[in-house]
């Protein structure tokens, strides 16, 4: 059985006090869930959040540079994340691609560096409105180029249709399920059927407590990468219960 996940991508939200308060409230109301729960605060809060983090909450960075050290102003490397005991990271989010012009080649380098360092990586992929689903195959082919089969056990994929991120639009359960099934076909073509069936693939894109249950009942969706709806600890705990 594939591992289920519920990961909150906080983006550039919450000050340090709010981030710590979330964790303290989370600890007071343990979630009854079979899913791996995680949060991704901004980089500057990772160290302090990690100090109060319970064992049943995974801490992720929102990005990592593929260069271990050097003259790269404004970036945080994967080795520096590991120095502060952060061993999980989101790579390739559409906002990184859109606002920071990250190409598939850059994402491939980040993915390769983080996986080779032993990190758990949540790789984001998704199409814009009007793009054919075959775009996902092209993107996967590029971002996974040169990545050894043995490293894929550390890989989680998050399918986030770009037209659904922060828009209030959500893919129907049928569309999300069928698209993720097609992603598994692409993985089997790039690697093999076993990898395709073993890899956890999440859905993201305007997921909230009001629609998560219906999405979670589909065969192919293995969890969720949630943005705005993950900022409220009570809503986060409600969403976690879909995998009770």
UniProtKB/Swiss-Prot annotation:
For this protein, what is the EC number?
A: 5.3.1.1
GO MF, any single term: triose-phosphate isomerase activity
Q: In which pathway does it act?
A: Carbohydrate biosynthesis; gluconeogenesis; Carbohydrate degradation; glycolysis; D-glyceraldehyde 3-phosphate from glycerone phosphate: step 1/1
The UniProt annotation places substrate binding at: 9-11, 166, 206
On the tree of life, the source organism's domain of life is Bacteria
Gene3D superfamilies associated with the record: Aldolase class I
As for subcellular location, the record says:
Cytoplasm
Task: Report the GO terms under cellular component.
Answer: cytosol
- Provide the catalytic activity annotation: D-glyceraldehyde 3-phosphate = dihydroxyacetone phosphate
Q: State its role.
A: Involved in the gluconeogenesis. Catalyzes stereospecifically the conversion of dihydroxyacetone phosphate (DHAP) to D-glyceraldehyde-3-phosphate (G3P).
Membership in a protein family: Belongs to the triosephosphate isomerase family.
Q: How does it assemble?
A: Homodimer.
This chain belongs to the protein called Triosephosphate isomerase
């Amino acid at each position: 059985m594939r591992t289920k996940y519920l990961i909150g991508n906080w983006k550039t939200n919450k000050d340090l006090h709010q981030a710590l308060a979330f964790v303290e409230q989370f600890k007071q109301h343990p979630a009854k869930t079979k899913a791996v729960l995680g949060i991704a605060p901004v980089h500057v809060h990772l160290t302090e959040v990690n100090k109060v983090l319970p064992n049943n909450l995974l801490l992720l960075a929102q990005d990592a540079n593929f260069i271990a050290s050097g003259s790269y102003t404004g970036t945080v490397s994967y080795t520096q994340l590991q120095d502060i005991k952060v061993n999980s990271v989101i790579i390739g989010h559409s906002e990184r691609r859109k606002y920071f012009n990250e190409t598939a080649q850059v994402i491939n380098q980040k993915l390769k560096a983080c996986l080779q360092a032993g990190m758990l990586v949540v790789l984001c992929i998704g199409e814009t409105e009007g793009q054919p689903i075959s775009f996902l195959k092209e993107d996967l082919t590029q971002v996974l180029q040169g990545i050894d089969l043995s490293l894929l056990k550390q890989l989680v994929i998050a399918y986030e249709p770009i037209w659904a991120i922060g828009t209030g639009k959500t893919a129907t359960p049928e569309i999300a399920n069928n698209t993720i099934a097609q992603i598994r076909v692409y993985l089997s073509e790039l690697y093999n059927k076993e990898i395709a069936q073993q890899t956890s693939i999440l859905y993201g894109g305007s997921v909230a407590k009001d629609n998560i249950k219906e999405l979670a009942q589909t065969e192919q969706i293995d969890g969720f990468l949630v943005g705005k709806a993950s900022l409220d600890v009570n809503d986060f705990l409600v969403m976690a219960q879909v995998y009770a």
